[in-house]
Amino acid sequence: MENWKQKPLSQVVSRWIRGTTLNRSRADYYTKTPGPESLPWARVGDMKEGLLCETENYLTKEGVDQIPWLIVPEGAVLLSVSGTIGKSAIAGCDLVVNQAIQAMIFDEGQILPEYACFYLEFYRPWLIERANAVTVPNLTKEQLSGIPVVFPCLEEQQVIVDQLKRARRLMQRSRRSEDTLNRILENAFGKMARSALKEGKISRDEELLSPVLRPIWVSLKTRALPAERET
């Protein structure tokens, strides 16, 4: 675990883009047909596993020209933060998202987008738990910024990503359920987290731990960590 680090999400994301919805009465802003100057306009319902580039609706050039600063570049990580919480995907091309999606451009010198996407998928129970449930569940940038992200060097991240992608492909071929993927994610990140918790590389603040990690920490506490036995 020597190569592992922990940082808040705010320190590994170089740019945040929260989407919007243009005036739906402006028919010239929207199209169902992709074209050379249009961009996909992603909503939560468009988010599938892996890369996202095809959407139900697209913004025309006229629409895109209204919000050029909100164009999400290829490779950004997408996270649903309103209504349906915690779905994740990666922008497979330049696109625009609506207000229910938070796009994050990661510092790829620290974290690979695919690793970040899988990590957020693993962390989804915590995201759902923390969402502001008034009428519609919602997560703010401030809430996301403090998420503790645990990550190894880029080479090890790629190994983890390759293993998880292979497991996902096998799962899809055998038509296994989403629960199977959740178990795979928990196995991949849970073992790592257990070691990191033991060594103090993950914050032991139970308020910051995901519902998946919290039971691991509680079980470790009851058995007393080595560092605690020394004090």
Predicted region positions:
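Non-catalytic DNA-recognition/assembly elements of restriction-modification systems
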Residues: 1-25, 146-231
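Basic, amphipathic alpha-helical recognition segments used for DNA target recognition
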Residues: 8-16, 47-54, 70, 74, ...
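Sequence-specific dsDNA recognition surfaces
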Residues: 10-31, 45-74, 231
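Juxtamembrane/interface motifs at transmembrane-helix termini
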Residues: 27-31, 45, 74-75, 134-138, ...
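A short, glycine/Asx- and small/polar-enriched loop/turn
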Residues: 35-38, 143
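ATP-grasp fold ATP-binding core
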Residues: 42
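A generic structural signal for residues embedded in beta-strands
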Residues: 79-80
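Short, charged beta-turn/beta-strand-edge "cap" motif at the junction between a beta-strand
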Residues: 84-87
